[in-house]
Amino acid sequence: MKRISLVVVLLMSIQMVAQSKPKVRTITGFVRLGQNTYEKQIADALIVLRMAKSEFETAGYQVQTLRLTTQPLSELVVGMSNEQALAFLARLDQLSVKEGFLPNVGPAMIQDADDPATMHLLELVLSTLPDIQASTIIADEGGIHWKTIHRTSELVKYVAEHSPRSQGTFKFTATAMLKPLSPFFPGSYHTGPGRQFAIGFEGANVVADIFTKDRRNAEAATADLTAALTTHAKVADNIGNKVAQETGWSYAGVDPTPAPLGDVSIAAAIEDFTGAKFGSSGTLTAARIITAAVKAVPVKQIGYSGLMVPVMEDKLMAQRWAESTYNIDSLLAYSAVCGTGLDTIPLPGNVSIEQMDRIYGDVASLATKWNKPLSARLQPIPNKKPGDQTDFQDPYLFNTTIHPLP
């Protein structure tokens, strides 16, 4: 009987460990494609990414996506007319489906002085091609890019009105103070020669395990979460360095941000800790704990390295948004202590370009004030007003209620 009990305990312990293991959200490669050599370059890059994927699977991790980020859009299509560029990008989009990777063409505007014509091309890309993702940079160490902000608002308005079910806006974000080589889309970008890769986790379940155990104990939760995240980040670091050594590619680092998705909910984890609904008092404290733990992970970090709170990608978060337990101002407040920003925010269809300018400006102002990477993925929905329900038909978006703008 004792032997049977011991076996049961061991099996339960193994199961608990397995449940606590995060998924690898992305292994992202960074490439500088030639217009005549891109197919061979992508094939070579996928060999590297698939090697890393195999290493993770051998270690017991599920890898969700392989991704490729190209040089910035204007450099990718240099010398092409809009028609030629669209045809080229359509081939890239089709190749991504065939080969099983997600494509990102980087920022259409990096500086305010950049030619805004690239933004017009991106409007067409996001409105007509199903998979390519992209971004703009609205703030960096040099300050806030006000012209880029305004052109970004115009782009988002256009894509919302011209893409099927307005879902093209899901593939675009504006970043502020985010450095190159982030593995997470849509804000990922690079400006170098390529042949690099980075890793990002989906680890909200790890946070949930710790916050359930250390409920309302901030010190214990910070220490235990740091230790748990470190365990998995070191696996990524070891795999990254091994693959780099074997392939000649450079390993850029890991983003330990515990990204949520669907039922793997960061909102649920935070509620486990606070004992109250997401958005209640204590939510900001929980956000600070998560960010402190992430920042303390002793590996080569890249990207946001903080906390993601995507309103419509997290099932419980979408529900709490519908209940109005938090809003845009709440998310901006949380962004003061973590890398939140405004992610997958549904907006009424009649939102003006000037209103979006102000929202992007707030995110850029907060990012530059505190020197932290933030992003804003705004999703206006034509013919929808405050109080209406969104009706996206996307497996990664959970429909919710549209808030009035303040």
Each PLM stretch: what is its role?
Residues 19-406:
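Anaerobic metallocofactor- and corrinoid-dependent redox/one-carbon enzyme cores
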Residues 4-13:
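Sec-dependent N-terminal signal peptides
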Residues 14-18:
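Sec/Tat signal peptide C-region and signal peptidase I cleavage site
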